Amino acid sequence: MSRSAAASGGPRRPDQHLSPAPCGASGPPETFRTESDGAGTMNKLRQSLRRRKPAYVPEASRPHQWQADEDAVRKGTCSFPVRYLGHVEVEESRGMHVCEDAVKKLKAMGRKSVKSVLWVSADGLRVVDDKTKDLLVDQTIEKVSFCAPDRNLDKAFSYICRDGTTRRWICHCFLALKDSGERLSHAVGCAFAACLERKQRREKECGVTAAFDASRTSFAREGSFRLSGGGRPAEREAGDKKKAEAAAAPAVAPGPAQPGHVSPTPATTSPGEKGEAGTPVAAGTTAAAIPRRHAPLEQLVRQGSFRGFPALSQKNSPFKRQLSLRLNELPSTLQRRTDFQVKGTVPEMEPPGTGDSDGINALCTQISSSFASAGAPASGPPPATTGTSAWGEPSVPAAAAFQPGHKRTPSEAERWLEEVSQVAKAQQQQQQQQQQQQQQQATSVPPMPTMAPTLQPFSAPVGPFDTAAAQVAVFLPPTHMQPPFVPAYPGLGYPPMPRVPVVGITPSQMVANAFCSAAQLQPQPATLLGKAGAFPPPAAPSAPGGQARPRPNGAPWPPEPAPAPAPELDPFEAQWAALEGKPAVEKPSNPFSGDLQKTFEIEL
């Protein structure tokens, strides 16, 4: 009843309260019902006042809007604002389903897309970050194998390309912001067409043909696409005009140029004109081909180099590399090989003052020249005993071998051995003369144990004197001299032993013979002294005036411990003379072989 009174709007007592609606009452209160009806009425009113959207027309139904995109692609000014979703590897090189699966996979990854700008041109596709202006993707158009819009998302677009480094198929996906995926796909198709037209034009100009073999799924290309000029028509026409003007204009005679160099182009010309004017057009290229641009010749000419030390490049420079595992390529080895090929006498060492000398080459020169220079003392008269130096003085021929200005005969090993053989023959002749003189003196002098004045003209006595042992001690090589120097001088009192023929042996065998002869010279004085001990000791020699007999050069004779007997026919000397008189028999050249014949034998 209160409900009816309240609804009727009559007066209400203060103690009167509104009771809630029973639970079983259906529907909201009347006030709520009235508000809902008013809201619905207002929504209908608003919808009636709004403009209706035009009916959706797909992109394929309005191709007139894409004509501007084709021109922009050829000019390189076509761009679209997109969101770059990223790239993912795919298994196939083409197919719309492959692109759609790649878009789904990238969206499922939850990666944040990058707001960027897609530039489409006949050269390639470039994606530039809109905020940082970084180049995200730079794709050559020839590497793109497939592009398509997404059938599930109107603004999705993706393309498949071959990765240049890993050789895998990669799918790049985009979401267009203002345009649809179909428009982006159409622009990329225009880029394909422009690239194909450019390639066909190059094939026609360069004469390139490609033969495709279906059985081998390969093609063979003949010719080259490498043009040396720009690919745009404007550049080609400009190049044709320049060539026509250059052919029509008379050629100006250039000034005198340096030999081996083309006259440089003036610096006022542009780099393009330099390359076109300075480089001749090849006969095989067509008239439309522009020659490749090169650097000007004045930049390619060597300006100079620092050559402050010309002595370092000489043959005997001490700064050359001497240590190498390849011994045949060492500078010192090459120098020794080439020195034998030079005709005439070449000084091995430069005169003092230049300062350029090679220690290794000098040492080798001294060793080799010691054998070659041995013929100089043999040509003169045999040195007499009276001309020998004092006991403490060094020998003159030994010092002459170390002169820095000596010269070596630059010949082959055969010529070197021939000179050594001549020296040996000269020594043999000298020894024969000495033996003849000894025989004459032995027959004319009576066998008295006293020393007679007739012993002075002896050139090289072979008898068992103590002075002979002293002479050997004088000519023994010092510590600083190499042993090969000992047999090179004919002034020795004893011939070099063993006398092995030197013709036809190698230089190493010659050095070995020299060492053997130097080693066998030393035990002879002791042997001869032992032989001399068999004679009775004679009285001390005295001069007629009772004074010591002076030497012809003014120096006094050294004190002799025991007088030596007069030279007489000793069995050892007779055997030695018999061996010297025999002709030289050909013996094996190797001193280390076991079949050497016995020349002499010493009994102790």
From Swiss-Prot:
Tissues showing expression: Preferentially expressed in the nervous system. In the developing neocortex, expressed in postmitotic neurons in the cortical plate but not in progenitors within the ventricular zone.
Keyword terms, alphabetized: Cytoplasm, Developmental protein, Neurogenesis, Phosphoprotein, Ubl conjugation pathway
Protein name stated in the entry: Numb-like protein
Ranges of Basic and acidic residues composition bias in the record: 233-245, 409-418
Record's compositionally biased regions (Pro residues): 553-568
Region span, Disordered: 1-68, 223-283, 372-457, 531-604
UniProt subcellular location: Cytoplasm
Name of the encoding gene: Numbl
